[in-house]
Amino acid sequence: MENDVKENLEEEEDRLLPPPPPSQSLPSTDSESEAAFETNEKILIVDFESPDDPTTGDTPPPFSWRKLWLFTGPGFLMSIAFLDPGNLEGDLQAGAIAGYSLLWLLMWATAMGLLIQMLSARVGVATGRHLAELCRDEYPTWARYVLWSMAELALIGADIQEVIGSAIAIQILSRGFLPLWAGVVITASDCFLFLFLENYGVRKLEAVFAVLIATMGLSFAWMFGETKPSGKELMIGILLPRLSSKTIRQAVGVVGCVIMPHNVFLHSALVQSRKIDPKRKSRVQEALNYYLIESSVALFISFMINLFVTTVFAKGFYGTEKANNIGLVNAGQYLQEKFGGGLLPILYIWGIGLLAAGQSSTITGTYAGQFIMGGFLNLRLKKWMRAVITRSCAIVPTMIVAIVFNTSEASLDVLNEWLNVLQSVQIPFALLPLLTLVSKEEIMGDFKIGPILQRIAWTVAALVMIINGYLLLDFFVSEVDGFLFGVTVCVWTTAYIAFIVYLISHSNFFPSPWSSSSIELPKRVSVSNS
């Protein structure tokens, strides 16, 4: 009798205890998929409201500055993609060739980027899963692997630009002593060093990014103050939309650099670093409100930094012979020749800002790579192992590029054009799954976006894809030469368009018999007001 009672008590204990973590050696299933952040890694959101007045139902708790501080972090990590070396090159070329005339477009492109990133955050907060994980369940196996491949290609392309940007900055700051390939090695090593900080908590890593963003802000603000661009022209450029046939390519570059495919995946994972109860509707809405404030502030800062760079080069090189030749490699030298030394030579100020941009973006790129690979493939690997794999995928081609193009500025510019094309090609494969998922009630529950926001989001997505399509068409018309190359491009273009049509047809926005009904996700339970 005593044994029976003992066994019953043990069984009851087992039911009350949380399940043990799945073994690393066992094959993973959907129910065992690895979370973006473990429970002990998440930041606890403390309630500062009075315990006598608990918030229930649909109404979020009142605004709290202390709680906003707890939510601050993911938006600033997300904003790094708006400040990477590729964006800085787009800024300097826009300023040198178009002057102040595209500042209005930079502002509205940043606003469009904020909308897309908030949809990504919405998916992460409302479902408790990030975009790559949801894509794994939403699409059939063949489509999932295509999406994963495209995301990895986009990430590698962005990483090459970011690492090369850091390497150029290191070359500038070492006065040419360190070659480009040495800068690549240093950047790769630094990245692992910074990622090590994650073991000491998410807040430590976020603090490092805050320092890097502050470094960029101070460096480029110093350049802005030293060069004294025209305040009148700056305000006209922001408030008066202007676009000429001579600046269309730069305009396309400004918009195209704002939406980074890997950043859409990244933000949906970063917001899960805060411990939020997804079953309480008021808490989910509260988190979305704070993330909107935080992301808006972060992207306003990124807009100001991009504005500083654009106006500095507009002041120095607009209307000059050097305008069409300026790029990331020679920008520092041109600045030095134009504006000279001062207390701290502008060449080194530019180098410090560029280094901060390159270092921060390579770290977020590695971070995004872990979520993309882990989410799509559901790999049961330790974080450092995933970091090694994803970092190697980018560092190896970057090292080859650095060795081959070490002394050729023209070749690096051509390579950068091809990398921009690669990024543009991948944009639909992040935007379309995001818009599909955020519009589905069975996934989002009460946080599915409404018809008006759906139309706005699809309009923005269509605009971004059309603009990038123009960039692709313009590039291939000027670069594609030879019958075999032309046929290859046509074949790949046909397959590319067919897959985009499939993704669009899979969404709820455009009902189609192509939409898969065989893949069913567990319906998200809506939270009642009681």
Swiss-Prot record:
Organism: Arabidopsis thaliana
Subcellular location: Membrane
Membrane topology term: Multi-pass membrane protein
NCBIfam families: nramp, Nramp_1
Residue spans crossing the bilayer: 68-88, 96-116, 153-173, 177-197, 205-225, 251-271, 297-317, 339-359, 395-415, 418-438, 456-476, 484-504
Protein name per its UniProtKB record: Metal transporter Nramp2
Lineage: Eukaryota, Viridiplantae, Streptophyta, Embryophyta, Tracheophyta
Alphabetical UniProt keywords: Ion transport, Iron, Iron transport, Membrane, Transmembrane, Transmembrane helix, Transport
UniProt-listed InterPro entries: NRAMP_fam
Biological processes, Gene Ontology terms: cellular response to manganese ion; iron ion transport; manganese ion transmembrane transport; manganese ion transport; positive regulation of unidimensional cell growth; root hair elongation; root morphogenesis
Function: Seems to be involved in iron uptake.
GO CC annotations on file: membrane; trans-Golgi network
GO molecular function, one term: manganese ion transmembrane transporter activity
Gene label: NRAMP2
Record-linked Pfam families: Nramp
Region spans: Disordered: 1-35
Similarity comment: family membership: Belongs to the NRAMP (TC 2.A.55) family.
